[in-house]
Amino acid sequence: MAKYRCGNCWREFDDEQLRALPGVRCPYCGYKIIYMVRKPTVKVVKAI
């Protein structure tokens, strides 16, 4: 399941809630700009 964040109210929701409305809009405020939240990953870099 992908997580999304609204560009206006900054609430997070999943793709099931996104499919509930026609088009791509925030289910809470109806804003059209939505960001996909990335999982926090740690990048390990070998020291030289």
UniProtKB/Swiss-Prot annotation:
Recorded superkingdom:
Archaea
Tell me which family the UniProt entry assigns to this protein.
Belongs to the archaeal Rpo12/eukaryotic RPC10 RNA polymerase subunit family.
Assembly with partners or alone: Part of the RNA polymerase complex.
Work out whether the entry's keyword set contains Transferase: yes
Q: What is the lineage of its organism?
A: Archaea, Thermoproteota, Thermoprotei, Sulfolobales, Sulfolobaceae
Co-factor(s):
Zn(2+)
Q: Name one GO molecular function term.
A: DNA-directed RNA polymerase activity
Question: Which gene holds the coding sequence for this protein?
Answer: rpo12
Q: GO cellular component annotations, sorted alphabetically?
A: cytoplasm; DNA-directed RNA polymerase complex
Q: Which UniProt keywords apply?
A: Cytoplasm, DNA-directed RNA polymerase, Metal-binding, Nucleotidyltransferase, Transcription, Transferase, Zinc
| Physiological role | DNA-dependent RNA polymerase (RNAP) catalyzes the transcription of DNA into RNA using the four ribonucleoside triphosphates as substrates.
Q: Name one GO biological process term.
A: DNA-templated transcription
Which leading EC class covers this enzyme? transferase
Per the annotation, how and in what number is the cofactor bound? Binds 1 zinc ion.
NCBIfam families linked: PRK00398.1-1
Statement: the UniProt record of this protein carries the keyword Zinc: yes
Which protein, by its recorded name, is this? DNA-directed RNA polymerase subunit Rpo12
Q: Identify the residues that bind Zn(2+).
A: 9, 26, 29
Reaction(s) catalysed by this chain's protein: RNA(n) + a ribonucleoside 5'-triphosphate = RNA(n+1) + diphosphate
Question: Which EC number(s) does the record attach to this protein?
Answer: 2.7.7.6
Compartments reported by the entry = Cytoplasm
